[in-house]
Amino acid sequence: MSTRDATDVFSEWALIDRDEGMESGHAKSVNEMLNIVIPMLKKPFSAIDVGCGNGWVCRKLQAYENCSKVVGIDGSSEMIAKAKQKGTGEFHLSTLPGWKPSQKFDLIHSMEFLYYLKEPLEMLKILFNEWLEDQGVLIAGVDHY
């Protein structure tokens, strides 16, 4: 029995607008996460959303007046296409851990991403050691239904 690559599944979801349900399904959790971390950040702050999908969290972060830069990364080509179509910002198509940002970030946000990795602990080490600014914050959510 073979398993399908998650990026292929999410590209299919984007094509049939199922990505919109991701926002409605995760908004409550993401809002709680952001309510915790935003007050902890220096001003202005930079942020990256790892597994950004259609970019809805990036758009939410851009709405904070003290947010100076937002980057999104996702492995689904169709999700990145939607992110670019729906908003302004910097979006990258790549699977991880094979991509590295050109700068470090004050906030690393991730929702429903880590369990798709073969080595999530290794990715967390990379995020902390290579992507996160000193005194930065990483927050990752995994919904449990």
PLM feature spans:
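Conserved class I S-adenosyl-L-methionine
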Residues: 1-40
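Short catalytic micro-motifs in class I SAM-dependent methyltransferases
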Residues: 112-113
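A short glycine-rich, Lys/Arg-flanked "PGG" loop and its adjoining helix->strand segment in the class I
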Residues: 121-134
